[in-house]
Amino acid sequence: MQLKKNDLINLTIEDMSSEGEGIGKADGFTFFVKDAIIGDSIVARVTKLKKTYGYARLEKIVEPSEFRVEAPCAFHKQCGGCQIQAMDYKKQLEFKENKVFNNLVRIGGFSADFIEKIMEPIVGMDNPYRYRNKAQFPIGKRKVCGEDGSEKWEVIAGFYAGRTHHIIANTDCLLGVTENQEILETFLVYMTENRVSAYDEETCRGLVRHLLIRKGFASGEIMVCVVINGDKLPAEDKLISLLSGIRGVVSLSVSINKENTNVIMGKKIRTIWGKDKIKDTIRILNGEDFSETGDSVEFAISPLSFYQVNPVQTEKLYSLALSYAGLKGKETVWDLYCGIGTISLFLAKRAKKVYGVEIVADAIRDAKENAVNNGIDNAEFFVGKAEEVLPDFYEKEVAAGRSATADVIVVDPPRKGCDAMCLDTILKMQPKRVVYVSCDSATLARDLKILCEGGYELKKVRAVDQFAHTGHVETVVLLSQQKPDDYIEVELELDEMDLTTAESKATYKEIQEYVLKEHGLKVSNLYISQVKRKCGIIERENYNKPKSEDAKQPFCPEDKEMAIKDALEHFGMI
């Protein structure tokens, strides 16, 4: 029988999607079911059908999974924030680790055996609740029945239901800090008593759109920012009196956003009481066991600052990235997509020089301020797209006859991953190590494939759970210049007795220096050897032979081949 919409189907959930939907198969279709977890046997109702897959709504759990737990939040099924709260936390970690593993194999093209060998255990949370230092609550209204039976409107705050803009009223999200509830409920009282209207997305009328709350976990300082569809809040003095009395609140501001847009924050921020920014401190931990090192970096955070929302896991994430960078104090490092300089300032504590690049000008201003506040003078920041700033730097340095290389390049791109031009320039600069911090393992796998095809070897992979009870996972990866066992080792000293006349005219080092100066390219001894053979220059019998008969050798790219030939002509070798 042909399946159709509204049909009931029996499913056993065998896997989960990246968005946390349960995946099961029926009648040749793969179905995605919200609120179902691995191991559940369910009855679901078909809601949408495509050619080979479809979506279904959970109707009944026939046999619950051994990994199913009682979710502590009564709103988790309605709210779009927690997709997998009903799954045991250990199983959540396994699911996320498998997600990274499978993407590296399926998209990256790496062998499962290889990834299994280099992948380190996922870094989970000690407490997977109350971890968010920032929350943006939409403000709306709903009809309620009064004591006399009449209907009236009341203002509400909460979160949007999944894939909608319908507000689920909830002032105590279990992922947020406990102070959120008192602040929200106090703010709603202020709105009710002073007849402050809530913004209506359909009519674009009403004043209050969102309430942003941020907390510095280390400092205890709390910032409250009201996003309004106007220029001023009524009775600001009353709001200040109410909120300033809440423990920890040190900053009250207004964000003006009159645009008909889904963007939450407006560009203009006005502080109405207290500080313009709050402070927080991120500790630098030992990257091996996350023990204390006694070192840290302090950050000033504004309502618009990009700052990781889980500070406890951020310490582990960035300390791991710092450990992978392998800094000894003499390195030049580039930090691409640097935000307010969180990773940059970590790196600057261990490197000789750090260059940070970020497209958001306000973030770069914050980065520079944070560097000054921490007494860091070896970090320099640039406003612009990574795919424009890095290539521009490279081309200018090469044109001036200077080395355009870096010892380490760190990237922490958005979900779409690194731009192709950015990856191309990284390959041209040939850093000794590349550290990739990713928030999307699918685009990570795609980019790693490009970097490894360009001469890098994947050395370490480790997932970090930044967002418990959601389908999202961060990943830190280390790549180094390719020197696996099945590639040849090259000696720099030549046996003069075995040299041909052509070989004696220039050493490999001289050829490399010429190519770097004239073409801005770094070439390996292997590439030079391959081009020399093509040009009829006979090498010594034992030179550049692989260690084993089935060893793979990378072939010289066309641009580097032309540059090497130019060098050979320059030295009169061809």
Give the ranges of each region predicted by the language model.
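Extended interfacial segments that mediate partner engagement and assembly in macromolecular machines
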Residues: E59-A71, K77-A198, L233
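Short, acidic/hydrophobic/Gly-rich beta-strand patch recurrent on exposed beta strands
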Residues: G22-D27, I156-A161, C225-V227, A367
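Rossmann-like S-adenosyl-L-methionine
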Residues: Q2-N10, S18, D231-E503, Y508-K509
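Terminal RNA-binding accessory module
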Residues: M1-F75, E380-F381, E388
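Carbohydrate-binding surface patches
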Residues: L212-G216, I222-K232
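Phospho-regulated, low-complexity intrinsically disordered regions of nuclear gene-regulatory
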Residues: K505, Q553-I574
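Short Lys/Arg-enriched helix C-cap and helix-to-coil transition segments
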Residues: E539-E549
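DNA-recognition alpha helix
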Residues: T507-H519, S529-C535
